[in-house]
Design a protein with these regions (language model features):
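Sec-dependent N-terminal signal peptides
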Residues: 6-18, 26
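Short polybasic/polar patches that bind polyanions
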Residues: 72, 140, 178, 267, ...
Length: 330
């Protein structure tokens, strides 16, 4: 009887040891599976990313400016410049086009109007630099819910980047994010197809998403009621980012500023607009609740919260991960 009990005890011990070893091997397998992968969770905006980071739901967060700089007052630190990592990954030192200006086809046909609009957008770049300290007050007065610290303005990379200069990048985005292989040239504004039609009159509706894109039209907001563009008064509407595409889809925006690939994809699918220019290039930063710096290799096995699913942030981050031998978890 005693021998039988000893035998049973021995078997039980072996079973426990095997189970323990199996658990160890399983853990090793899981760690190996995570060695080259990064879990990416997408959020609607920078505020949601920051909330998830503060709650410990994610390890790192990717947000745009001005949220990255404004986050310092909430205990967040910038640990990675995605523009620098993108340049290393792709060899493209000029960054990636983000928010872009789309105009109705009828307006794009009038070179007088387009030239006047581009001139105002160029003047705006100087305006926001000279008035950086007042951007929060100005834009919040127009409906923005974002803060625009003066230090963030240069990092928002606001400019006027003509369609021809960003076309190749946008086409690649459309291929990667929207499965569009052949983007028609007709998506982009072509001044040779426009004619001088003189000044017009009336009020045009411009829609722009909250955040850095609104900086591109700060001068129009500041001088609304006095500044005209080729005879037109332009009324600026700052709206939530997740509603911006509807203003091209419905056609109620005469001018719409939205993510480069999103607007181009709508035009490729029949919307009567032209891609005029990009307004911001590369404004993405990775933030953390800890100070220091993080490399792409450090992200293996981590969870990263990111804005912009199916938009430029996803495109840029995946390009960086791929170049560093990492993949996103499905």
């Amino acid at each position: 009887m005693k021998n039988k009990i000893k035998k049973i005890a021995a078997i039980a011990t072996v079973v426990v040891m095997v189970a323990a070893l199996a658990a160890v091997f399983a853990a090793c397998d899981n760690n190996e599976g995570n060695e080259g992968s990064v879990r990416v969770v997408y959020y609607a905006d920078g505020a949601a990313v920051q909330a998830a980071l503060a709650a410990g739901v994610i390890d790192y967060g990717i947000v745009g400016e001005p949220a990255a700089t404004a986050g310092a007052s909430k205990g967040f630190s910038v640990v990675m410049d995605l523009q620098a990592e993108y340049a290393d990954a792709t060899g493209n030192e000029s960054g990636f086009p983000m928010s872009s200006t789309f105009v109705k086809g009828s307006l794009a046909a009038n070179k007088t109007f387009v030239d006047a609009l581009l001139a105002v957008l160029e003047e705006n770049v100087t305006y926001i630099t000279e008035n950086a300290a007042s951007m929060t007050q100005l834009l919040q007065g127009a409906g923005s819910t974002s803060a625009y610290p003066a230090a963030s303005i240069p990092r928002c990379n606001v400019g006027v980047y003509p369609a021809a200069s960003v076309k190749a990048d946008v086409n690649d985005m459309l291929n990667v994010l929207n499965d569009v292989d052949n983007v028609p040239d007709s998506v982009y504004y072509d001044e040779t197809q426009a004619t001088e039609q003189g000044n017009g009159s009336g009020v045009l509706q411009l829609y722009v998403p909250d955040g850095a894109p609104a900086l591109a039209v700060a001068k129009l907001i500041a001088e609304e009621g006095t500044l005209t563009v080729a005879g037109y008064t332009i009324e600026v509407n700052i709206v939530p980012a997740n509603t911006i595409a509807a203003h091209i889809a419905k056609g109620d925006g005469d001018i719409v500023i939205m993510p480069a690939n999103g607007g181009a994809n709508l035009i490729a699918n029949g919307a009567d607009y032209k891609f005029l220019c990009s307004n911001t290039r590369g404004i993405l930063y990775m933030i953390s609740t800890s100070e220091g710096s993080v490399s792409p290799e450090d992200l293996a096995g981590k969870t990263v919260g990111c804005i912009g699913q199916n938009a430029v942030p996803q495109y840029a981050f995946e390009r960086i991960l791929t170049a560093n031998g990492l993949v996103t978890e499905k």
